Amino acid sequence: MMSGTLEIEDVFTAYDKADVLQGVSLKVEPGRITCLLGSNGSGKTTLVRSILGLTPSRLGRIVFDGADITRLPTHKIIAAGIACIPEGRKVFPKLTVEENLRVGAYQERSDKVSAARLDEILQIFPRLSERRTQLAGTMSGGEQAMVSIGRGLMCAPKLLLIDEPSLGLSPRLVKENFSIIRSINERGITVLLVEQNVHQTLAISHYGFVLSKGRVAASGTPTELAARQDVRDAYFG
């Protein structure tokens, strides 16, 4: 079996005793791009935080490659092979591009391995190679998005969680970033793509789930989801 399988089993997660996630169950198959669609307030980011151990679930299980990670601390979840590209293109503005990327490999003890990963990332993102000494805070939004994705790849994840990669970007940069996400998946990395941009997301995904009010409201292939009238009414205008 390929690595990167994530299983969410009847998960409830609460803020201030109010359940935001109400029995969410879904499976991210290895080697695929699985998307999680939903409007603001649907529970998408809460689910990402629960997977990462930042907002632990109240009930249910989260299983990664056969191991129960529900109660693990975040650093151990990352060490198990899960990385996250957070919403909002978060970079360290006072660090250079290269320094930002190297932060992603903080758990790797071999300088040789870290250097090899850095070279690979710079091949994926030639623009970052050209600007490796530039302060990340002086870069454009699209370039900062590349830095954020590259930093996530530096830990050689089995599963990459990408939260709202289109947020605040021009249509051209959105298309470019989604092309990069597809190429990352083609390298064998499983992707869970959390998005509101339905058209672009379904175009590159193998399977998807729609979250509404903390529950899975629909699931299926991109073709199946696009054919559903309730999904079309909610997301296709």
Predicted segments with their positions:
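Conserved ABC transporter NBD signature motif
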Residues: G60-A67, A80, S114-L118
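ABC ATPase C-loop
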Residues: G152-L153
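ABC-type ATPase nucleotide-binding domains, specifically the catalytic core motifs of the NBD
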Residues: D16, T34, L72, V97-A116, ...
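Helix-to-loop junction immediately C-terminal to a conserved catalytic motif
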Residues: L52
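Conserved catalytic motifs of ABC-family nucleotide-binding domains
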Residues: A156
